[in-house]
């Protein structure tokens, strides 16, 4: 053993000539000896050529530039906490006949596949459990990935919120994800979870949260057991959980999170997580979005963050874009670049006011966007109306969303067995026609999340911070960011990759949302830089890009929104015409009914005849009869 270890002593290591001129720090052999394993660790942590520690956690990351590594989004495949997964499988799913859950989940999937559909609260106990079996995993992964992005941008040491509010239709999904990110020792001052819908969802939240260590009440940190005792306790606990399959008496479960059914109006929170909560009625867009975002911003504490999660479809993106527009007011700052915190006007119309006057509207409330936007100018993809995407001409409209892979736990795999939720696939690629079938394609145990998100940060309201914001705005220190700019060359304004990079032999093409406020297309070739080319081939959608490129051009022309406004007016006109025709037919049927009742003998009563006619003409006929 010792012979093998000492075969890699420093004097036997040959250095390249390019390193001989470097002033390497003097390394002592004792620094590399592990006294427990009696061996030698040549490099105990990943270091660069000067033996300085880096952010890399493996050899692949070590090859990347430090800026590239800093701009990467969370890479690991997401996976639900095994204890939570086991509790869902044993204590929630096990009490139902599987096909009953599949049938309810199938109906809900069909419902949300309709154009511009929205998530809604669960109405029955069966819908509650079907939601957990089908939708919970998607929401968990979307929130987890968004919170990891927030944690990376503000720094792990600065991401320790003490007052948290989670609002959603699920079993406190945001709290579950936050607990997994910050670990078992995370015990903040306040955690509120607002669960809208059927009261049974709160009972399910108790079961799920009780499987996380940081939800245990009255833990005694002083009397810490030995490692062997902890291992024994853990095995006994797992054995007991494996034995118990069925319903749980939730009244005896105590957790740290406060479960609520109403949204607070007076408290302040350091972190607010909103999952599908800005719009509940598609016909109320955008008024309802404005009202809801205003309410939640009013309870956001100085220095706090608000995380908005929506579906990764056109409706979800337009909700996000509207919340961004009403908060940042980019139309009032046409000449401003960078991420100078913007004054929140609380719904007051400020069009036409000068920048100096805007600070007086709300002198101590300023907001800036953390992610995913690298700028605070008008969103280049926003069209302002989700209905535009339903037109034939609107199918080519692009929108901003992100994807992430998450491993399916046992309950999710079991749910999607059988014919109800099986996905047909033909295996037409290559010579794979023999693989034609249904179910989980190739037996894969993961699914792809599809979501849109937005993260705001409220600035502190101390005097020094407010003076600094005013100074930055008055001096306009950032100037103008042209096409191809990296902004201030920090992660605050690096361009973000919004489509999967196109990787070809010798070059990589990337679509970026850039600090210039435009969509740009950058091309990185091997001849430009081997290191940057290597990093570009490792990039993914959702990353920040921190290096230059060989070619940088504007990627998308200005949207012709006027054309879609005209199409939308024609669509509304056609809908009104159809409604008038339907009402006219109902009127004619009613008149015929009156005539027949006056001159003919019928075996049906008036009410029965009207009821029969209503089956042909719908509610419009009954409404007309009531008006009559």
Swiss-Prot record:
BP GO annotations: mitochondrial small ribosomal subunit assembly; mitochondrial translation
Q: Which cysteines are joined by disulfide bonds?
A: none
> Which GO molecular-function terms appear in the entry?
4 iron, 4 sulfur cluster binding; metal ion binding; methyltransferase activity; structural constituent of ribosome
Answer whether the UniProt record assigns the keyword S-adenosyl-L-methionine to this protein.
no
Q: Which residues are the transit peptide here?
A: 1-15
Which InterPro entries does this entry report, sorted A to Z? Mt_RNA_Methyltransferase, Ribosomal_Rsm22-like, RSM22_mit_bud, SAM-dependent_MTases_sf
Residue positions annotated to bind [4Fe-4S] cluster are 373, 379, 400, 513
Subcellular location field = Mitochondrion
What is known about what this protein does? Mitochondrial ribosome (mitoribosome) assembly factor. Binds at the interface of the head and body domains of the mitochondrial small ribosomal subunit (mt-SSU), occluding the mRNA channel and preventing compaction of the head domain towards the body. Probable inactive methyltransferase: retains the characteristic folding and ability to bind S-adenosyl-L-methionine, but it probably lost its methyltransferase activity.
Q: What protein family is recorded?
A: Belongs to the methyltransferase superfamily. Rsm22 family.
What name goes with this protein? Ribosome assembly protein RSM22, mitochondrial
Species, as recorded = Saccharomyces cerevisiae (strain ATCC 204508 / S288c) (Baker's yeast)
């Amino acid at each position: 053993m010792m012979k093998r270890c000492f075969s890699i002593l420093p004097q036997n290591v040959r250095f390249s000539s390019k390193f001989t001129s470097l002033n390497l720090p003097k390394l002592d052999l004792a620094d590399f000896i592990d006294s427990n394993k009696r061996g030698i660790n040549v490099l105990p942590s990943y270091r660069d050529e000067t033996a300085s520690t880096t952010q890399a956690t493996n050899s692949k990351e070590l090859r990347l530039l430090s800026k590239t590594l800093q701009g990467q989004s969370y890479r690991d495949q997401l996976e639900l906490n095994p204890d939570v997964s086991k509790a869902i499988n044993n204590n929630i799913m096990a009490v139902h006949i599987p096909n009953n859950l599949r049938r309810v989940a199938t109906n809900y999937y069909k419902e949300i596949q309709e154009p511009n559909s929205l998530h809604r609260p669960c109405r029955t106990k069966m819908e509650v459990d079907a939601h957990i079996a089908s939708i919970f995993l998607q929401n968990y992964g979307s929130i987890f990935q968004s919170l990891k992005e927030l944690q990376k941008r503000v720094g792990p040491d600065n991401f320790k919120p003490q007052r948290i509010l989670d609002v959603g239709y699920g079993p406190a999904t945001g709290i579950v994800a936050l607990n997994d990110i910050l670990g078992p020792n995370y015990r903040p001052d306040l955690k509120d979870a607002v669960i809208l819908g059927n009261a049974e969802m709160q009972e399910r939240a108790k079961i799920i949260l009780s499987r996380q260590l940081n939800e245990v009440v009255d833990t005694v940190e002083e009397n810490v057991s030995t490692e062997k005792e902890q291992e024994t306790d853990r095995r006994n606990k797992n054995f007991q959980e494996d034995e118990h399959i069925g319903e749980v008496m939730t009244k005896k479960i105590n957790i740290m999170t406060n479960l609520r059914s109403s949204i607070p109006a007076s408290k302040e929170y350091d972190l607010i997580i909103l999952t599908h909560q800005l719009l509940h009625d598609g016909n109320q867009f955008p008024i309802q979005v404005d009202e809801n975002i205003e309410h939640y911003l009013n309870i956001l504490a100085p220095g706090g963050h608000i995380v908005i999660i929506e579906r990764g479809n056109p409706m979800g993106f337009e909700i996000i874009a509207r919340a961004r527009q009403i908060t940042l007011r980019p139309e009032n700052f046409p000449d401003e670049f960078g991420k100078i915190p913007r004054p929140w006007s609380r719904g007051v119309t400020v069009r036409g006011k000068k920048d100096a006057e805007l600070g007086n509207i709300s002198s101590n409330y300023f907001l800036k966007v953390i992610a995913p936007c690298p700028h605070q100018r008008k969103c280049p993809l926003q069209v302002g109306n989700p209905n535009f995407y339903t037109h034939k001409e609107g199918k080519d409209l692009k929108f901003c969303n992100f994807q992430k892979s998450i491993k399916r736990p046992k309950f999710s795999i079991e749910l999607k067995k059988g014919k109800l939720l099986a996905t047909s696939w033909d295996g037409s690629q290559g010579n794979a026609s023999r693989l034609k079938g249904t179910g989980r394609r190739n037996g894969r145990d993961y699914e792809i999340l599809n979501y849109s998100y937005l993260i705001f940060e409220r600035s502190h309201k101390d005097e020094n911070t407010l003076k600094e914001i005013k100074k930055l705005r008055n001096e306009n220190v950032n100037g103008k960011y042209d096409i191809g700019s990296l902004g201030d060359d920090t992660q605050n304004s690096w361009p973000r990759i919004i489509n999967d990079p196109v990787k070809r032999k010798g070059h990589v093409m990337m679509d970026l949302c850039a600090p210039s406020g435009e969509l740009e297309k950058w091309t990185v070739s091997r001849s430009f830089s081997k290191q940057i080319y290597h990093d570009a081939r490792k990039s993914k959608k959702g990353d920040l890009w921190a290096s230059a490129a060989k070619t940088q051009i504007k990627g998308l022309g200005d949207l012709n929104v006027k054309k879609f406004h005209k199409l939308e007016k024609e669509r509304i006109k056609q809908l009104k015409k159809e409604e008038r025709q339907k009402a006219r037919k109902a009127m004619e049927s009613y008149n015929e009914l009156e005539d027949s009742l006056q001159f003919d003998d019928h075996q049906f009563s008036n009410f029965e005849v009207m009821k029969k006619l209503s089956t042909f003409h719908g509610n419009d006929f009954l409404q007309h009869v009531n008006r009559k």
